[in-house]
């Protein structure tokens, strides 16, 4: 699904320097070794060109070449993304189904239903995200830290949990989601009862 041209929209609105867009191949090529890019107004690009020039002597040209050889062109990249979708879709479907069945009836949390990407963002009762994940960890389920989507991981509400279902096989993921949902309910119950 194409994104709106927000850079062009800002330019039309007379605010061309308002937005910086960033993208990375880290989740689609080599985890932790992807390449990134930035899109912005000419003035913002000129500014960052000066900043980048001071920060580094040279870009990792070997890694850039590796990506060019691997991704080749738009068609190859789209084919790769279809392969990713074939692997990821069942995992996301299962995560969302478990949340719908086990958490939605309780009414204390909400989450996005992504049409792409690699995460489900869940917002639970304020003050319970860290506790829910601590309980899950005690039960053997490791997840991304609470508040990971916030700068420095500091969620002022202690309510956001980013679910990243890409690694485990569906069967393991389903068991992990059962444990997670139980811990999420227990943390909410503790909060409601002031335990």
Task: Write out the residue ranges for each language-model feature.
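Conserved PLP phosphate-binding loop immediately N-terminal to the Schiff-base lysine helix
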Residues: 1-7
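Conserved core segment of the aminotransferase class I/II
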Residues: 10-89
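PLP-dependent enzyme catalytic core of the Aspartate aminotransferase-like
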Residues: 14-15, 154-195
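Short beta-strand segments
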Residues: 21-23, 37-39, 112-113, 119-123, ...
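Short, solvent-exposed loop/turn elements at beta->coil junctions and helix N-caps
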Residues: 23-26, 108-109, 147-152
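Conserved C-terminal alpha-helix-loop-beta "cap" of PLP-dependent enzymes
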Residues: 45, 49, 119-162, 170, ...
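A common structural junction motif
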Residues: 56, 138-144, 181-189
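Conserved glycine-rich beta-strand-loop-beta hairpin in the small C-terminal domain of fold type I
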Residues: 82-96, 108-123
């Amino acid at each position: 699904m194409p994104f709106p041209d927000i850079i062009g929209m800002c330019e039309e609105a007379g605010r061309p320097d308002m937005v910086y867009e960033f993208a990375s191949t880290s989740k689609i090529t080599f985890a932790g070794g992807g390449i990134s890019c930035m899109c912005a107004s000419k003035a913002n690009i000129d500014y960052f060109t000066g900043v980048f020039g001071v920060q580094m002597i040279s870009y990792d040209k070997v890694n850039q070449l590796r990506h060019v050889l691997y991704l080749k062109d738009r068609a190859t990249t789209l084919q790769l993304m279809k392969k990713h979708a074939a692997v990821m879709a069942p995992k996301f479907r299962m995560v969302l189904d478990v949340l719908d069945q086990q958490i939605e009836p309780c009414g204390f949390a909400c989450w996005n239903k992504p049409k792409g990407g690699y995460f489900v963002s869940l917002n639970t009762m304020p003050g319970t995200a860290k506790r829910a994940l601590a309980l899950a960890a005690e039960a053997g389920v490791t997840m991304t830290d609470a508040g990971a989507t916030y700068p420095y991981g500091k969620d002022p509400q202690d309510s956001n949990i980013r679910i990243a279902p890409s690694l485990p096989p569906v069967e393991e993921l389903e068991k992990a989601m059962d444990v997670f949902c139980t811990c999420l309910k227990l943390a909410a119950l503790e909060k409601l009862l002031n335990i």
